[in-house]
Amino acid sequence: MNRNPDQNTFPNITLKIIETYLSRVPSVNEYHMLKLQARNIQKITVFNKDIFVSLVKKNKKRFFSDVNTSASEIKDRILSYFSKQTQTYNIGKLFTIIELQSVLVTTYTDILGVLTIKAPNVISSKISYNVTSMEELARDMLNSMNVAIIDKAKVMGRHNVSSLVKNVNKLMEEYLRRHNKSCICYGSYSLYLINPNILYGDIDILQTNSRTFLIDLAFLIKFITGNNIILSKIPYLRNYMVIKDENDNHIIDSFNIRQDTMNVVPKIFIDNIYIVDPTFQLLNMIKMFSQIDRLEDLSKDPEKFNARMATMLEYVRYTHGIVFDGKRNNMPMKCIIDENNRIVTVTTKDYFSFKKCLVYLDENVLSSDILDLNADTSCDFESVTNSVYLIHDNIMYTYFSNTILLSDKGKVHEISARGLCAHILLYQMLTSGEYKQCLSDLLNSMMNRDKIPIYSHTERDKKPGRHGFINIEKDIIVF
């Protein structure tokens, strides 16, 4: 029997908190399920909604001024959401509402509300780079890698972009300045800060509080536009979440990383924003070209890649004094693939203290082998490298999440060989190891190369797991 509790049965304070929140006397089941949430519920109840409404209006004025929404509509949407629990009787939905409201009342002001107050002065820190001088070199390098054959019958997934991306980008530019200890950017926007001729879409970010930020942003968009906003988690991308609107249009995504990982990511400071060091980004680009899908992207729009690569090449030339004279020495390092066991052996003794690197193409096999080694010194850099690294008895063990291209039966294509070398160099940069001579040789090994057709490629590691999501409108959290 679902009876109403009487005041002699339950502690008066807890009952009163729940009763005030629900605007009704809770059932016995509701009381027992919600009593441990009393502290969060009380914070929600005493939260100053008027100040919150004011902050959202200021955010709207600054970042979403072109969205046709009145102040009264924004207020009504906010008050409606903060009273939603009064018309909700499903315990699971009540828990979701409490969790999301708790995020708003405890974090919104510090995360997004702060963007409405006067910002610190921007410290101009740009260096003038001569990107034009690198364009021909970048084009030559990319042309030799433009070897993918596009299957016109292949159905490509469409990436629909929301019209709100430009508004969110404006907000993100300020967010990156205010929260530059916990959020950094990479990709096209970061290169745009170096070279204003770079075109960019959404802003790619790494941060230490991704889930909280995305929830706050999703509600800001919901309150301003009235649209249902959905947050999705993709199982095969580590700690990745994306915000989409009700029509599945992409708004923004983010990777979450630990603070200790954030601390070691190489970065530079431009106009109060930290961006991932373009040297590191260049290595990631070289690594990603081992992915067959990325080569298909190159084939479709080579000029987009050329602008980015030229920018990064000029950065490494200026910063590290790299001389592009074609002297490659031992690059790319020798790579031998065991297709049955899906392991590539890279000979590293010419450059590093460890004599070879065993690159696993299946992450669970690597994890099992590391356990068998009884070694506890592996480094996990999360989505920054999509891999752990371990050096044990002069051998590096690591995982490579991309495809391996073959130029002939059993022969690793030089594009993938360079990608594997870049993957090892990422570790060297993250651990403050030596990498500059190896970097110079790697980049010079990309010069004056003929196109080599792709014979075949390995399949990517299949990641288990299910998609997760937060649906604000339906009060559902599945993770």
From Swiss-Prot:
Coiled coil: none
GO molecular function: ATP binding; metal ion binding; poly(A) RNA polymerase activity
Keyword Transmembrane included in the entry's annotation: no
Annotated catalytic residues: 202, 204
Record keywords, A-Z: ATP-binding, Calcium, Early protein, Metal-binding, mRNA processing, Nucleotide-binding, Transcription, Transferase
Catalytically driven reaction(s): RNA(n) + ATP = RNA(n)-3'-adenine ribonucleotide + diphosphate
EC number: 2.7.7.19
Gene3D superfamilies linked: Poxvirus poly(A) polymerase, N domain (1.20.1270.320), Poxvirus poly(A) polymerase, nucleotidyltransferase domain (3.30.460.60)
Top-level EC class: transferase
Ligand binding (Ca(2+) 2): 202, 204, 253
Known partners and oligomeric status: Heterodimer of a large (catalytic) subunit and a small (regulatory) subunit.
Protein name: Poly(A) polymerase catalytic subunit
Gene: OPG063
